[in-house]
């Protein structure tokens, strides 16, 4: 249960980080 929760948490963090990174790249490409 704890391991599954940690995995879900990591996935959320990675997903949020990826979205933020994509947004930052788009802003640089199209300022």
From Swiss-Prot:
Annotated keywords: 4Fe-4S, Electron transport, FAD, Flavoprotein, Iron, Iron-sulfur, Metal-binding, Oxidoreductase, Transport, Ubiquinone
InterPro entries documented for this protein: FAD/NAD-bd_sf
Catalytic activity: a ubiquinone + reduced [electron-transfer flavoprotein] = a ubiquinol + oxidized [electron-transfer flavoprotein] + H(+)
Domain of life of the organism encoding this protein: Bacteria
EC number(s) given by UniProt: 1.5.5.1
Cofactor(s) essential for the protein: [4Fe-4S] cluster; FAD
Subunit structure: Monomer.
Gene Ontology molecular function terms on file: 4 iron, 4 sulfur cluster binding; electron-transferring-flavoprotein dehydrogenase activity; metal ion binding
Residues that, per the record, bind FAD: 11-25
Broad EC category: oxidoreductase
Functional description taken from the UniProt entry: Accepts electrons from ETF and reduces ubiquinone.
Cofactor: record remark: Binds 1 [4Fe-4S] cluster.
Protein name: Electron transfer flavoprotein-ubiquinone oxidoreductase
